[in-house]
């Protein structure tokens, strides 16, 4: 922290400085600019987009204006009922109300004034659709595809999407397209062929880059926002890490960054917005706050998120909350990639089971991914056998479905698995007993578990954990598998195993904020001039994950809210 009571700080001056370049950060920057404020965005990395760029890009917006037109229904009362039930003891009525009230306004604002368009996803259910106020779809919205050519030179500094979201690591899909293909719905093969043909025949773009011109998911979202920044002349400085916040004794009035290898002071006359991610890549903070064991290399988040904003806030006396929680997801290692890949959909397919070192199940494999991680650690506390866990599947699963690092065997047979991956990344054996020996899992326990799973496949009812028992479970199931799309016999040799680590797409804990995104001290007082959102702030959703897009939706909404509050405070100051 720097304190300058002589008001001489700053090598440059803006009304607002935004730290970070994900969707929440850029939404705050756009809204502040459009309210008449001068804005600078600073990003520590040499590429922009943050965690948003590698994400699915969805936003969870109850009561959005597309629901009725698509044949659905929603209401504020239902959304409040659902969140009160799901969020539970962490329910903050004022913050939740601000989120529900401003989320649809934020979407409408971006649609009208920026390049950013969203499409509601009709059949993507809330993560707990059977809870009070839960919905079978519509609340999640995904960004419309965006033509990368519209970015010009800024395409070169857009953080690349996760290869896991692309066909063959190259070809982009929307969320709706991905579901059609993964669930093998009617027309899926024709759709996949059309996407591949479009990519292959884009000769002009292929000469520039192997990346797809048609951006989707998180890449489409940050690209559209970056184009809107450019249109307004809002500067985004890359390779500019924040080193500290600056105060004039009473309020935050700027930041000290590193620019061209030296300290550079930036005065922010009206506010600083911290939107620079969580602490996934900071092993010391993980060791201090998260359940054990925990390793930064297990994360699916970009390795730039080291808790800079959280630590800067703590230095000013800010309060923190939820520091022991993450937006958890099971992850798998991929040689040559900087981060692990999340297992988002593979667990829902039939003919697979997740077990610990004892060969026992500990969770409904199809459950929302944060619940899998909660269960993984809860059971590990008793057994010390869950880290790592293992996804076990048979030859029929291998043939039909993608899994972590591999395309379906019908497309990528074992003969095309990269050299050195067998019995290192993916394990294979002629029998379950042999497979258990290779991976250090109790053979008898595994055999008993598979026998029970095969019985559940016949009846369609998982009496232990209820796999396939609700609408969300079945979303990525295989509709051709009867009577339960998430259950099938594990019986065809060879058998396979994939190591599963307790990773995350981001940490949940961060600076405690109010309904205006202002950072608070432990006594509830406001740190004037300082705002936080996204994973730099403690999650408005508490320890839970109500639906797809519950990370980015609040980040963007509170970016919008923060900008409005800064603008209103500016107006009050000059009255």
What are these regions (language model features)?
Residues 1-79, 118-122, 127-451, 455-575:
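Residues forming the flavin
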Residues 76-88:
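A contiguous, well-ordered beta/alpha segment that forms the leading edge of an enzyme domain
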Residues 85-129:
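Long, well-ordered early-domain segments
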């Amino acid at each position: 922290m720097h304190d300058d009571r002589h008001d001489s700080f700053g090598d440059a001056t803006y009304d607002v400085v935004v730290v970070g370049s994900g969707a929440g950060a850029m939404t705050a920057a756009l809204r502040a600019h459009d309210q008449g404020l001068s804005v600078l965005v600073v990003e520590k990395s040499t590429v922009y987009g943050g965690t948003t760029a590698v994400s699915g890009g969805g936003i969870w917006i109850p009561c959005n204006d597309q629901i009725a037109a698509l044949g659905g229904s929603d209401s504020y009362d239902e959304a409040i009922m659902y969140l009160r039930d799901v969020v539970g003891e962490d329910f903050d009525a004022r913050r939740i109300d601000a989120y529900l009230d401003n989320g649809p306004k934020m979407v409408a604002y971006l649609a009208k004034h920026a390049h950013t368009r969203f499409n509601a996803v009709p059949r993507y259910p809330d993560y707990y659709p059977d809870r009070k106020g839960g919905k079978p779809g519509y609340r999640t919205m995904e960004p419309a595809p965006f033509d990368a050519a519209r970015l010009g030179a800024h395409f070169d500094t857009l953080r690349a999407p996760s290869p896991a979201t692309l066909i063959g690591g190259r070809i982009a899909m929307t969320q709706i397209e991905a579901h059609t293909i993964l669930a093998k719905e009617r027309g899926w093969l024709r759709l996949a062929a059309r996407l591949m043909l479009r990519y292959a025949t884009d000769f002009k773009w292929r000469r520039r880059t192997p990346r797809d011109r048609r951006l989707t998911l998180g890449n489409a979202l940050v690209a559209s926002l970056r184009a809107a920044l450019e249109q307004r002349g809002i500067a985004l400085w890359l390779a500019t890490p924040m080193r500290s916040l600056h105060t004039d004794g009473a309020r935050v009035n700027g930041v000290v960054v590193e620019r061209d290898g030296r300290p550079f002071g930036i005065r922010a006359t009206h506010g600083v917005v911290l939107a620079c991610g969580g602490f996934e890549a900071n092993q010391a903070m993980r060791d201090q706050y998260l359940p054990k064991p925990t390793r930064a290399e297990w994360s699916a988040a970009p390795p730039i998120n080291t808790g800079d904003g959280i630590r800067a806030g703590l230095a000013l006396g800010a309060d923190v909350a939820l520091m022991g929680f993450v937006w958890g997801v099971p992850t798998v290692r991929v040689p040559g990639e900087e981060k692990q890949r999340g297992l988002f959909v593979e667990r829902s397919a039939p003919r697979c089971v997740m077990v610990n070192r004892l060969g026992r199940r500990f969770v409904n494999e199809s459950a929302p991914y944060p619940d899998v991680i909660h269960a993984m650690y809860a059971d590990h506390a008793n057994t010390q056998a869950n880290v790592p866990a293992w996804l076990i599947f048979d030859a029929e699963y291998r043939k039909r479905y993608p899994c972590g690092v591999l395309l379906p065997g019908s497309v990528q047979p074992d003969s095309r698995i990269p050299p050195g991956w067998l019995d290192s990344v993916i394990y294979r054996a002629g029998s379950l007993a042999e497979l258990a020996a290779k991976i250090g899992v109790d053979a008898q326990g595994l055999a008993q578990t598979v026998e029970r799973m095969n019985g559940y496949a016949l009846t369609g009812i998982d009496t232990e954990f209820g796999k396939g028992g609700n609408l969300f479970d079945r979303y990525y199931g295989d509709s051709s598998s009867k009577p339960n799309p998430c259950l099938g016999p594990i019986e065809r040799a060879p058998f396979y195993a994939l190591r599963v680590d307790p990773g995350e797409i981001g940490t949940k804990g961060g600076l405690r904020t109010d309904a205006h995104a202002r950072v608070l001290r432990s006594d509830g007082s406001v740190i004037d001039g300082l705002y936080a959102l996204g994973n730099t702030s403690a999650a408005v959703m508490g320890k839970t994950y109500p639906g797809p897009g519950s990370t980015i939706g609040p980040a963007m909404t509170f970016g919008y809210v923060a900008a409005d509050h800064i603008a209103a405070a500016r107006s009050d100051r000059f009255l």
